[in-house]
Amino acid sequence: MTNTLTSTFADLGLSEKRCQLLADIGFEAPTQIQTEAIPLLLSGRDMLAQSQTGTGKTAAFALPLMDRIDPEGDLQALILTPTRELAQQVAEAMKDFSHERRLFILNVYGGQSIERQIRSLERGVQIVVGTPGRVIDLIDRKKLKLETIQWVVLDEADEMLSMGFIDDVKTILRKTPPTRQTACFSATMPREIKELVNQFLNDPALVTVKQTQSTPTRIEQQLYHVPRGWSKAKALQPILEMEDPESAIIFVRTKQTAADLTSRLQEAGHSVDEYHGNLSQSQRERLVHRFRDGKIKLVVATDIAARGLDVNNLSHVVNFDLPDNAETYIHRIGRTGRAGKTGKAIALVEPIDRRLLRSIENRLKQQIEVCTIPNRSQVEAKRIEKLQEQLKEALTGERMASFLPLVRELSDEYDAQAIAAAALQMIYDQSCPHWMKSDWEVPEVDFNKPVLRRGRNAGGGQNKSGGGYQGKPGKPRRSSGGRRPAYSDRQQ
């Protein structure tokens, strides 16, 4: 097994040209999966790798492939992915790792013109990245011929299994030469994946990147209890004002919630868009590019759609709706705090969610820090702080000079400080979101009060959330108005 202390890509056997390219695009040191997988793949071994999303697995198979591909040859490599979004990400990454003008990489998936893909195949490509369904379609049309394939990669094989593509994958593998080199990447190892590996891989090397079920330590987790009578959308507004995320994904359960929440956040002045299954392929691609380029800061997404929304340097993840299990929770928040950076995960919890929250915390073997929703004075102080920073920037700008005559004229009648304060007040009022102009105060949330079960006739709907959290005898009730550390007096 490769020495896990290897610190450079050159030590892994990659070419000098490839290593220089990696340095140019900011890749400093290999991850564990890259350290283990790259030498094996360069040596020609088949490989089975168990690795989670976010560990650098794309580079683990793409880099050795790029070092061995012939840019002037026929079709040599086939990479299968469960979704078109992942196919796009893989293809884009491989182009970043190559910069070889003569090398052609083709994406094939549904939602795009198959005629255009056929024309590209006829012109000649060296690498095909695609979903099993579209690959099968092109094979059946006799437009995609696999006789010259030397390398096959199965990316997220367990996801292809769960989406019903495993038979298509087997059909495709049977049409490739038995001498091919095959690499299979899977986060989990169900029986069907093991059977596929035994059938189609030749004495594969096993690489396992262990990832504990606890949350990554670089991610700060916080939860906010939504006050009774408040909606989660209302609770989220002051939280976003205080956090002011550089980039965030807000997870919701349904497409309708995504649409409603996006509309409400847009009305409040946030740079936000929605990402769900109803969007066309072109709409998805456009949104992903805008998000990666920083043109929008917030994306409201469902879990299924968000598989294609992989963005580096994500500062926040917001669980607007809690997921049904701890694994999904970990996967969601694992999108932030990557590559040695810190991140923050926020969860909104209503009384009906408390049993689900307990199950997540029990699985994680940790309690999530409880915070109170920021009150009006805190939000106003934050907005004034931002206004102060904007003012400092404006004082160094060139456009300020055009306003100096007006200031001198006003100074004849008014105090200079009063003029500045009035101008700032005007700017503050104009930029203040509509929800802040209404009378609102954050109700105190009694964390020790049990969550009562209510029937239809009790006016509470079908709230069957159970007993909630109770404090130890003698514990004082917690006051509101600031952040509190995670507390240990909740019943588990």
From Swiss-Prot:
Stretches for region Disordered: 451-492
Effect of disrupting the coding gene: Probably a complete knockout; no growth phenotype or large transcript changes at 34 degrees Celsius; at 24 degrees Celsius growth is considerably slower, while expression of a few genes is decreased (groES, groEL1, groEL2 and sll1611) or increased (pyrB, sll1911, sll1515 and rimO) (at 70 umol/photon/m(2)/s, 1% CO(2)).
Keywords for the protein's UniProt record, in alphabetical order: ATP-binding, Cell inner membrane, Cell membrane, Cytoplasm, Helicase, Hydrolase, Membrane, Nucleotide-binding, Stress response, Thylakoid
InterPro entries noted in UniProt: DEAD/DEAH_box_helicase_dom, DEAD_box_RNA_helicases, Helicase_ATP-bd, Helicase_C-like, P-loop_NTPase, RNA-helicase_DEAD-box_CS, RNA_helicase_DEAD_Q_motif
Membrane topology: Peripheral membrane protein
One Gene Ontology term of the molecular function aspect: 5'-3' RNA helicase activity
EC number: 3.6.4.13
Regulation: Helicase inhibited by the slowly-hydrolyzing ATP analog ATP-gamma-S. Protein is rapidly degraded upon shifting from 20 to 30 degrees Celsius, the degradation machinery is only transiently present in cells grown at 30 degrees Celsius, is inhibited by commercial protease inhibitors and requires full-length protein expression (the N-terminal fragment does not induce proteolysis although it can be degraded by wild-type extract).
GO terms under cellular component: cytosol; plasma membrane-derived thylakoid membrane
Limits of the Helicase ATP-binding domain: 38-207
Reactions catalysed according to its record: ATP + H2O = ADP + phosphate + H(+)
Superkingdom classification of source: Bacteria
Chain location of the short sequence motif DEAD box per the record: 155-158
Pfam families, A to Z: DEAD, DeaD_dimer, Helicase_C
Subcellular location: Cytoplasm; Cell inner membrane; Cellular thylakoid membrane
GO biological process, one term: response to cold
Record-linked PROSITE patterns: DEAD_ATP_HELICASE, HELICASE_ATP_BIND_1, HELICASE_CTER, Q_MOTIF
Extent of motif Q motif: 7-35
Domain Helicase C-terminal: residue ranges: 234-379
PANTHER family linked: ATP-DEPENDENT RNA HELICASE DEAD, DEAD-BOX ATP-DEPENDENT RNA HELICASE 47, MITOCHONDRIAL
Family membership: Belongs to the DEAD box helicase family.
Free-text function comment from the UniProt entry: An ATP-dependent bidirectional RNA helicase with RNA-dependent ATPase activity; does not unwind dsDNA, uses only (d)ATP. Also has ATP-dependent RNA annealing activity; concurrent annealing and helicase activity promote strand-exchange activity. In vitro has low helicase processivity, annealing processivity is probably higher. Required for correct cold adaptation, probably by aiding translation of mRNAs required for photosynthesis and electron transport. Probably regulates the cold-shock-inducible expression of the GroESL chaperones.
Protein name: RNA helicase CrhR
Organism: Synechocystis sp. (strain ATCC 27184 / PCC 6803 / Kazusa)
Gene this chain is encoded by: crhR
